[in-house]
Amino acid sequence: MEPVDPNLEPWKHPGSQPRTACNNCYCKKCCFHCQVCFTKKGLGISYGRKKRRQRRRPPQDSQTHQSSLSKQPTSQLRGDPTGPTESKKKVERETETDPVH
C-alpha cells in the first residue's frame, strides 16, 4: 500500500474512483469496473425506487363486453331454493316420527 496524503479527503484518494465513468454496459469488464458497478450489474442489487409497471390498456371492445354482461340474468343460488328453514322442518318431522331414540 502506498502512503496516502493525510490532507486529501477520503473520496479524493488515488484509486478510490475509476479513471473512466460508469456506463450501462453489462459485459464482464464493465460489471467489475468499480464497486458500484459490481453491486448494480454483477449482483443485480439496486436500492433506488422501483418503477411502477403500467397496466396494459384494455382493447376498445371491452366496454361492449361489459354491457353484454350486465344484460345477462344473475345466477340463482345453488342448493335448496326454499332455504334452510325448510330443511329444519324436515329434521323436526323425522325426529318426531322416530321415537326409538
Curated annotation (Swiss-Prot):
Ranges where the record places region Core: 38-48
Bias-annotated ranges (Basic and acidic residues): 86-101
Positions carrying N6-acetyllysine: K28, K50, K51
Nuclear localization signal, RNA-binding (TAR), and protein transduction, short sequence motif: residues: 49-57
Cellular compartments annotated: Host nucleus, Host nucleolus; Host cytoplasm; Secreted
Binding site for Zn(2+) 2: C25, C27, C30
GO molecular function: actinin binding; cyclin binding; metal ion binding; protein domain specific binding; protein serine/threonine phosphatase inhibitor activity; RNA-binding transcription regulator activity; trans-activation response element binding
Residues marked Essential for Tat translocation through the endosomal membrane (site): W11
In-chain residues carrying the UniProt-annotated modification Asymmetric dimethylarginine: R52, R53
Region spans: Cysteine-rich: 22-37
Any one Gene Ontology cellular component term annotated for this protein: host cell cytoplasm
Coiled coil: none
Note: HIV-1 lineages are divided in three main groups, M (for Major), O (for Outlier), and N (for New, or Non-M, Non-O). The vast majority of strains found worldwide belong to the group M. Group O seems to be endemic to and largely confined to Cameroon and neighboring countries in West Central Africa, where these viruses represent a small minority of HIV-1 strains. The group N is represented by a limited number of isolates from Cameroonian persons. The group M is further subdivided in 9 clades or subtypes (A to D, F to H, J and K).
Function text: Transcriptional activator that increases RNA Pol II processivity, thereby increasing the level of full-length viral transcripts. Recognizes a hairpin structure at the 5'-LTR of the nascent viral mRNAs referred to as the transactivation responsive RNA element (TAR) and recruits the cyclin T1-CDK9 complex (P-TEFb complex) that will in turn hyperphosphorylate the RNA polymerase II to allow efficient elongation. The CDK9 component of P-TEFb and other Tat-activated kinases hyperphosphorylate the C-terminus of RNA Pol II that becomes stabilized and much more processive.
Protein name as catalogued: Protein Tat
Gene: tat
